[in-house]
């Protein structure tokens, strides 16, 4: 005691005195407590109990002495708080007192720290100081953060996680035992059951106790998930076998595996009727119907890709969906639709949208009990036990609002993504497609599904994307990019001025002006009147050039030049001949003019070109396919009126060619593009381009339908993703509606019936009468025959059967006024 400081010695002496007083005289305290309680309690037993409780409360055994082992200190303390204070003040010190020591000099410890807080926290490991107590279990901790971390194990969520993890491990052990016994052919028998007396299907009875492998009931703590025998059937009816890597086999239903023998002979009355098949493992199925996972069944083919995705294992689908929503919560993804987001959506949910597996994964991420409270719409798909036992993510109202706002922004971005792509190609397609694309995910379409009342909905989320995709108006003030000012002024003015802005700009003034005609991608073309067709430059220009050359090199031969000009004039004037029925009477002038010479010149000069409604067609262009004309009673007359001037043109051209070949100028008078030549006629017959664009081509160009296959596939994928995002919003906010929709889709999926070649008839009162479908088919066939009679098919070209002939069981589509038919002219 000589080495103690005065303060420590006084502390020690006071502590020893108090302890000796407590140890030497326990009776007075007992007497006082007994006296105090005797006045209030009437019974002697109450006196004894009260005195005993007061003794246990007041009496404390002396603490174990603590020796300070910092260098050669050697001081002895009996209170951990005093030891800790001694180490911090005397040995560690402070910077203000100029005695700070950041190296622990406790016996056998040389830890160096950077700050005083670090070393004072480290000193606690050398003292039995644990002032922080847990109110639940009474454990003590040195630091408050340790106590806070420990208190988490007493929460309800942590207990659920522990129970779920224990159940999952037990299910994995049970499955490994069953697989092990199946692989070795029963060499290691299962633990005996209480129902072993009832042998089933000739299986031998197992002994009550095996020497090497005791029963599971002997060690109940080793198998916490195995319930008592009365609940054994319930334990094995749970989808615990879906942890099997063989659960994706095609020959067994999803999430199930063949039941071992001990399952059957334990409860024979449960499996007596259908124990020899796998169908009893799928609840709610008729034993006579085939499972949808059978690849040879008709139902499997009807479901297509959805069932094949489910066969790949629902566990991976659960993980992908959970990873998607986990990244969404952690804000690892931006609400912008691009190629990466499209690929992520396709990998997570597939091309079929939300199916049973995806819906269960979405709902299990928020509330596992809501996922399996009802039977799934697809009975062949069993819920995964791993997902069923997976802890639910804590879903707060703010989290749901953020999730909905993210999906709303993503859907609006996907809806405007197609319009932004199509606007780069053409203005007409952008105007039509932007309206259609934004209509897929606008306020009106979302309000039809009740999505305008979900948490986090804001109309501005949809308006931002739509306004960005709209582009700049024609009469809007031009931005700096469209003005003629230098780029140095861009830093002075960031925001684009509006018409109602009265502030002075810091840079040069922006002059309001109209945008150029091609600012929005609009293309303008001049449309000529339909009274006459434009002259063909391929025929007219070479003739003029040839005349000029002839006039330069043959000035002495005026008669030949006049004859050649007469032939050229007759050829050019024949292009401006009307083919209307009213002008068909004028078609005889060319024949007379070609045969009579001077009389032909007079006839050609006197006859002026007609200004009828129909355009004038040259013989070269007449060989092409003309726009179709409505098939009615006037079809034959119209085709006759069209063919008559064409034949007269051909005969006149042949006469001119034969006459010019006899003359000395045969090399000039033979036209290069004469329709009488076989090569040109074959080329003209093979040409399928019409003179004017059809209505379908123009409408498809305006709506963006005439695009490449890649753009069409991207557009189809984008539309599927817009629908997928809308379905996700419905599934998250209205799970019951999503289940009902999946169940309805599952019941609605059917393949079309196989058509037979025998036409159906109705039998009424012994006589056979044609049905309405047959009347429509016969009417359509008669229309088709009328069209073929009115437009003869050239020889050598096969005639294809009509659609109503191929599908004789389906009613033919009635013809509409705007239907186009190709009219072929026999030239």
From Swiss-Prot:
PROSITE patterns: ZINC_FINGER_C2H2_1, ZINC_FINGER_C2H2_2
Bias type Polar residues, positions: 370-380, 779-790
Bias type Basic and acidic residues, positions: 535-553, 647-659
Compositionally biased residues, Low complexity: 7-54, 160-174, 237-248, 578-593, 603-612, 628-646, 664-687
Pfam family, one: zf-C2H2
Compositional bias segments (type: Acidic residues): 554-567
GO cellular component: cytoplasm; nucleus
Keywords (A to Z) from UniProt: Activator, Cytoplasm, DNA-binding, Metal-binding, Nucleus, Repeat, Repressor, Transcription, Transcription regulation, Zinc, Zinc-finger
An example Gene Ontology biological process: positive regulation of transcription by RNA polymerase II
PTM text: Activated by C-terminal proteolytic cleavage by signaling protease at neutral to alkaline ambient pH.
Cell compartment(s), UniProt: Cytoplasm; Nucleus
UniProt-annotated stretches for the region Disordered: 1-60, 153-174, 233-275, 370-392, 535-688, 761-827
Zn finger region (C2H2-type): 66-91, 102-126, 132-154
GO molecular function, one term: DNA binding
Family, per entry: Belongs to the pacC/RIM101 family.
Main function: Transcription factor that mediates regulation of both acid- and alkaline-expressed genes in response to ambient pH. At alkaline ambient pH, activates transcription of alkaline-expressed genes (including pacC itself) and represses transcription of acid-expressed genes. Not required for the pH-induced dimorphic transition.
Protein name as it appears in the record: pH-response transcription factor pacC/RIM101
Gene (UniProt): PACC
């Amino acid at each position: 005691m000589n080495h103690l400081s005065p303060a420590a010695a006084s502390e020690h002496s006071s502590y020893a005195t108090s302890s000796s007083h407590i140890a030497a005289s326990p009776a007075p305290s007992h007497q006082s407590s007994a006296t105090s309680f005797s006045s209030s309690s009437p019974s002697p037993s109450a006196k004894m109990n009260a005195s005993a409780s007061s003794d246990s409360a007041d009496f404390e055994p002396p603490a174990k002495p603590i020796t300070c082992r910092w260098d050669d200190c050697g001081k002895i303390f009996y209170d951990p708080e005093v030891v800790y204070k001694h180490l911090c003040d005397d040995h560690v010190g402070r910077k203000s007192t100029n005695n700070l020591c950041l190296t622990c000099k406790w016996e056998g410890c040389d830890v160096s720290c950077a700050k005083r807080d670090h070393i004072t926290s480290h000193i606690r490991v050398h003292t039995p100081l644990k002032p922080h107590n847990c109110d639940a279990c009474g454990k003590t901790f040195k630091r408050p953060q340790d106590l806070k971390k420990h208190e988490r194990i007493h929460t309800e969520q942590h207990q659920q996680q522990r129970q779920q993890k224990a159940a999952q491990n037990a299910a994995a052990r049970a499955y490994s035992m069953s697989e092990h016994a199946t692989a070795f052919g029963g060499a290691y028998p299962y633990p005996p059951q209480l129902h072993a007396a009832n042998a089933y299907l000739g299986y031998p009875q197992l002994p009550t106790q095996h020497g090497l492998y005791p029963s599971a009931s002997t060690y109940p703590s080793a198998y916490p998930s195995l319930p008592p025998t009365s609940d054994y059937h319930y334990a094995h009816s749970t989808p615990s076998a879906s942890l099997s890597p063989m659960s994706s086999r095609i020959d067994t239903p999803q999430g199930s595996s063949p039941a071992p023998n001990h399952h059957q002979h334990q409860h024979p009355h449960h499996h007596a009727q259908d124990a020899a098949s796998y169908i009893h493992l799928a609840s709610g199925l008729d034993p006579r119907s085939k499972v949808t996972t059978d690849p040879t069944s008709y139902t499997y083919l009807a479901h297509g890709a959805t069932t094949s995705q489910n066969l790949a294992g629902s566990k991976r689908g659960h993980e992908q969906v959970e990873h998607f929503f986990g990244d969404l919560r952690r804000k690892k993804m931006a609400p912008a639709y691009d190629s990466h987001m499209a690929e992520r959506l396709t990998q997570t949910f597939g091309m079929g949208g939300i199916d049973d597996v995806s819906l269960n994964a979405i709902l299990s991420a928020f509330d596992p009990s809501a996922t399996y409270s009802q039977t799934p719409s697809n009975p062949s798909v069993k819920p995964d036990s791993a997902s069923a036992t997976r802890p639910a993510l804590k879903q707060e109202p703010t989290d749901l609002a953020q999730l909905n706002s993210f999906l709303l922004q993503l859907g609006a971005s996907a809806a405007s993504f197609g319009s932004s792509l199509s606007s780069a190609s053409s203005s007409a397609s952008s105007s039509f497609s932007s309206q259609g694309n934004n209509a897929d995910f606008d306020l009106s379409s979302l309000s039809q599904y009740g999505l305008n009342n979900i948490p986090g909905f804001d109309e501005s989320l949809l308006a931002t994307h739509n306004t960005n995709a709209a582009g700049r108006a024609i009469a809007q003030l031009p931005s700096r990019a469209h003005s003629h000012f230098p780029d140095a002024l861009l830093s002075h003015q960031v925001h684009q001025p509006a018409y109602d802005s009265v502030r002075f700009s810091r840079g040069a003034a922006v002059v309001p002006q109209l945008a150029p005609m091609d600012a929005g991608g609009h293309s303008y073309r001049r449309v000529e009147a339909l009274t006459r067709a434009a002259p063909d430059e391929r025929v007219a220009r070479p003739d003029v050039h040839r005349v000029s050359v002839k006039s330069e090199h043959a000035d002495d031969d005026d008669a030949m030049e006049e004859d050649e000009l007469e032939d050229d004039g007759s050829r050019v004037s024949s292009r401006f001949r009307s083919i209307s029925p009213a002008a068909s009477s004028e078609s005889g002038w060319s024949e007379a003019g070609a045969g009579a010479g001077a009389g032909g010149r007079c006839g050609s000069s006197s006859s002026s070109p007609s200004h009828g409604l129909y355009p004038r067609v040259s013989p070269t262009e007449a060989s092409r396919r003309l726009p179709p004309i409505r098939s009615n009673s006037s079809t034959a007359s119209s085709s006759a009126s069209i063919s008559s001037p064409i034949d007269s043109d051909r005969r006149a051209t042949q006469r001119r060619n034969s006459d010019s070949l006899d003359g000395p100028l045969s090399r000039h008078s033979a036209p290069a593009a004469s329709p009488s030549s076989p090569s040109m006629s074959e080329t003209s017959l093979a040409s399928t381009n019409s003179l004017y664009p059809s209505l379908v081509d123009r409408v498809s160009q305006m709506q963006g339908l005439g695009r490449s296959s890649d753009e069409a596939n991207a557009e189809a994928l984008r539309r599927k993703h817009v629908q997928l995002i809308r379905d996700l919003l419905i599934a998250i906010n209205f799970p019951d509606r999503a289940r009902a929709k999946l169940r309805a889709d599952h019941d609605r999926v059917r393949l079309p019936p196989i058509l037979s070649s025998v036409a159906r008839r109705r039998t009424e009162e012994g006589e056979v009468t044609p049905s309405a479908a047959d009347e429509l088919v016969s009417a359509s066939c008669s229309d088709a025959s009328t069209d073929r009679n009115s437009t003869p098919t050239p020889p050598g070209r096969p005639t294809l059967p009509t659609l109503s002939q191929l599908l004789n069981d389906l009613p033919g589509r009635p013809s509409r006024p705007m239907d186009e038919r190709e009219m072929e002219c026999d030239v």
